[in-house]
């Protein structure tokens, strides 16, 4: 409370005091009356399933729309006598007293947005939610609440986030055009015109087409373009009922320029206005202002490229929806778009035609990517590696694979368990989860198979889809494997394992067999080459061992000590002849196949410990991890030889016989030979 000087006081003297908080306290008390059961409230606003009691004086003071509606009710006695009256979007219920109807039903505003606007009328505070921001702004323009309009303008200037149009619900009808079929009933967007029309006796004489056109014009007029909102001048106060044109369209210029919706157009007539035209007043109104909405779901973008990418997900373009892709407008110093010369030529950005896959319906931007995608359905792999023959569906992946042969593709991420290298850390993590861990959280619902990663499960699910039966044996296979399967019936096995003499129809199956059952990759046996019948000894003796006199090759020790070869008729076939070289060392004298010698020439990665050559770095890393690191113990120092093999040599042989001869030779040969070598200094010479 403060004292102010008042010149109107006479010479007798008077004092004038002003309470600055009086208006705030008055609004607070009125708000408490409204919330406490609607005490002393003289109007009930029904929005959807909710009711909002309020004071006419507060609504009329905040909203020029309510001021016009209540003024029309005061000037007409029809609603006061209890007769039914429909105010377009606001329906007056019977039972009103002197001063108009006590109930007003709002059809065009959701209860959530109207509650925020009503709270602002009593508290001068409003919560702006981005998901309902377009609806709030349109409702503020419709209700002619200038303060809320200025707040929305400020939000647009300061906010750069995407504004989402609210979803299609029964209680959100402000962003739906008249006659929308998904709601089940036509929407009346005039919101105040019909009551005044009924009061003047105009609505009864209008034809249905005129009523639809008037309702459409009012709906378009109440929803002008969103981003740039012009200042709203106060409506002139009238003592009597307002004219129907004034109540129907608060923005007469916009309403007169907007064409009415027509159900069917003939030749030469303008096209039917679509959803965005009815929402934003004129075709392309938002796009000219710098905001680009999607024509299907209503999502708003500020970048034309993002809008095109989003529309491609729907399978349509802006051109197909009836909108021309305009370049983003230039903004002036005040943040408003600069109007360009209307007489200048309008440029259309070239839009690519969207193409879709006929099988799965996926959308692609051109035919090249569509044809590349079709290979995933046919299983065709037209590109093959010139080095190893591995086939690929895409040329870029084949080129990347070819670089792995000459070492240009680095694999810095090494698995600590098996030594395999990877070019990316996520590939290493997927390898560890799938191979070296026992957790399988992702399960197949069809066959109950479990997998470590979701990608493995997704690849496995393809095995249960689109299987076709073989015409010969009736086995169900995917189309990608049917060609290889038919070779079994027509040609028979053409690729033979050089160790176990087992035949396979394709080289890829042979590679899997050799890696699974024999431990390391072996040279391919051509279609016209005789299979090796000596148990693969030629392959195992390809490398020269510098053993001293009296010693044998490691594979001979393993063969002679193994009971799995006792049933052979001639054990001499498994023994390899030896001859002494000039320096006194012994080496295996077994003929090496020609293709083996050729394959050795391709091995460019030598082992720094034993001098063995390998075809790739991954095989070299596996060899070092299995043979040298485990045998020597790595960082364990002198305890390495003791911990390299947890069992005795005899226990190792009996334990590992079931895993195959090659695993014994590659993984545990050094653990059986090195202890003898290490004991040489402990002989009579050392003692």
Curated annotation (Swiss-Prot):
Cited Gene3D superfamilies: Classic Zinc Finger, Potassium Channel Kv1.1, Chain A
Keyword Lyase: no
Listed transmembrane segments: none
Zn finger (C2H2-type) start-end: 292-314, 355-377, 383-405, 413-436, 442-464, 495-517, 605-628
Domain BTB per the UniProt entry, residue ranges: 41-130
MF annotations from Gene Ontology: chromatin binding; RNA polymerase II cis-regulatory region sequence-specific DNA binding; ubiquitin protein ligase binding; zinc ion binding
Region of interest (Disordered), residue spans: 250-279, 332-351, 564-587
Gene Ontology terms: biological process: male gonad development; negative regulation of DNA-templated transcription; negative regulation of endothelial cell migration; positive regulation of DNA-templated transcription; regulation of DNA-templated transcription; regulation of gene expression; spermatogenesis; T cell differentiation
Expression across tissues: Widely expressed at high levels during embryogenesis, especially in the central nervous system, especially to the actively proliferating neuroblasts in the periventricular neocortical neuroepithelium, in the telencephalic cortical plate and in the hippocampus. Also expressed in a stage-specific manner in the mouse germinal epithelium. While strongly expressed during brain development,m its expression turns down in adult brain.
UniProt-listed CDD domains: BTB_POZ_ZBTB19_PATZ1
Keyword terms, alphabetized: Metal-binding, Nucleus, Repeat, Zinc, Zinc-finger
One Gene Ontology cellular component: male germ cell nucleus
Pfam entry (one): zf-C2H2_6
Subcellular location: Nucleus
Disrupted-gene phenotype: Mutant mice mostly die in utero or soon after birth likely because of developmental defects in the cardiac outflow tract and/or neural tube closure. Few mice that reach the adult life, equally distributed between males and females, show a dwarf phenotype likely due to defects in cell proliferation. Deletion gene also results in disruption of the testis cytoarchitecture and block of spermatogenesis.
Bias type Polar residues, positions: 250-260
Complex formation: Homodimer. Interacts with RNF4. Interacts (via C-terminus) with TP53; this interaction inhibits TP53 ability to activate transcription.
Name recorded for this polypeptide: POZ (BTB) and AT hook-containing zinc finger 1
UniProt source species: Mus musculus (Mouse)
Gene this chain is encoded by: Patz1
């Amino acid at each position: 409370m403060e004292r102010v000087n008042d010149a109107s006081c006479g010479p007798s003297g008077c004092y004038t005091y002003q309470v600055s908080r009086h208006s705030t306290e008055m609004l607070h008390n009125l708000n408490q009356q409204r919330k406490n059961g609607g005490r002393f409230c003289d109007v009930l606003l029904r929005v959807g399933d909710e009711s909002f009691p309020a004071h006419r004086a507060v609504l009329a003071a905040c909203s020029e729309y309510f001021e016009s509606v209540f003024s029309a009710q005061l000037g007409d006695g029809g609603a006061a006598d209890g007769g039914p009256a429909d105010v377009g979007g606001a329906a007056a219920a019977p039972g009103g007293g002197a001063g108009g109807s006590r109930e007003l039903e709002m059809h065009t505003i959701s209860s959530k947005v109207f509650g925020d606007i009503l709270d602002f009328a009593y508290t001068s505070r409003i919560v702006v939610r981005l998901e309902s921001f377009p609806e709030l702004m349109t409702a503020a323009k419709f209700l002619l609440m200038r303060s809320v309009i200025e707040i929305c303008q400020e939000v647009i200037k300061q906010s750069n986030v995407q504004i989402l149009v609210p979803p299609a619900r029964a209680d959100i009808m402000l962003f739906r055009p008249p006659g929308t079929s998904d709601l089940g009933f036509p929407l009346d967007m005039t919101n105040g015109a019909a009551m005044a029309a009924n009061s003047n006796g105009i609505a009864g004489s209008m034809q249905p087409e005129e009523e639809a056109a008037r309702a459409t014009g009012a709906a378009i007029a109440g929803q002008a373009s969103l981003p740039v909102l012009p200042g709203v001048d106060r409506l002139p106060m009238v003592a009597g009922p307002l004219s129907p044109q004034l109540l129907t369209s608060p923005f007469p210029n916009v309403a007169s320029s907007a064409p009415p919706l027509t159900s069917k157009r003939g030749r030469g007539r303008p096209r039917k206005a679509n959803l965005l035209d009815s929402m934003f007043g004129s075709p392309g109104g938002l796009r000219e202002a710098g905001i680009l909405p999607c024509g299907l779901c209503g999502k708003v973008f500020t970048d034309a490229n993002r809008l095109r990418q989003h529309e491609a997900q729907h399978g349509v373009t802006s051109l197909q929806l009836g909108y021309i892709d305009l370049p983003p407008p230039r903004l002036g110093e005040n943040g408003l778009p600069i109007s360009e010369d209307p007489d200048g030529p309008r440029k259309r950005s070239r839009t690519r035609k969207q193409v879709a896959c006929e099988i799965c319906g996926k959308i692609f931007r051109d035919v090249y990517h569509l044809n590349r995608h079709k290979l995933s359905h046919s299983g065709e792999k037209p590109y093959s590696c010139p080095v190893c023959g591995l086939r690929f569906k895409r040329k870029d992946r084949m080129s990347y694979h070819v670089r792995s042969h000459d070492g240009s593709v680095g694999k810095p991420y090494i698995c600590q368990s098996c030594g395999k290298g990877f070019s990316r850390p996520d590939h290493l993590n997927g390898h560890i989860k799938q191979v070296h861990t026992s957790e399988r959280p992702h399960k197949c619902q069809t066959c109950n198979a479990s997998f470590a990663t979701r990608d493995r499960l997704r690849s496995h699910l393809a095995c249960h889809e689109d299987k076709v039966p073989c015409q010969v044996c009736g086995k169900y296979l995917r189309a990608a494997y049917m060609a290889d399967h038919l070779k079994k019936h027509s040609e028979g096995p053409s690729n033979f394992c050089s160790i176990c003499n087992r035949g396979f129809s394709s080289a890829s199956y042979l590679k899997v067999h050799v890696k699974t059952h024999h431990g390391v990759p072996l040279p391919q046996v051509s279609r016209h080459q005789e299979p090796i019948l000596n148990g693969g000894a030629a392959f195992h003796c390809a490398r020269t061992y510098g053993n001293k006199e009296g010693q044998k090759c490691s594979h001979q020790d393993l063969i002679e000590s193994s009971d799995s070869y006792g049933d052979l008729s001639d054990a001499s076939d498994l023994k390899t002849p030896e001859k002494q070289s000039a320096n006194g060392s012994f080496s295996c004298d077994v003929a090496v196949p020609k293709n083996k010698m050729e394959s050795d020439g391709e091995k460019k990665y030598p082992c720094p410990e034993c001098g063995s050559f390998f075809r790739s770095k991954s095989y070299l890393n596996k060899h070092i991890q299995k043979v040298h690191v485990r045998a020597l113990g790595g960082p364990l120092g002198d305890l390495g030889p003791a911990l390299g093999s947890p069992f005795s040599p005899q226990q190792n042989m009996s334990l590992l016989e079931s895993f195959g001869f090659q695993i014994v030779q590659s993984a545990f040969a050094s653990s059986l030979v090195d202890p003898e070598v290490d004991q040489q200094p402990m002989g009579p010479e050392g003692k």
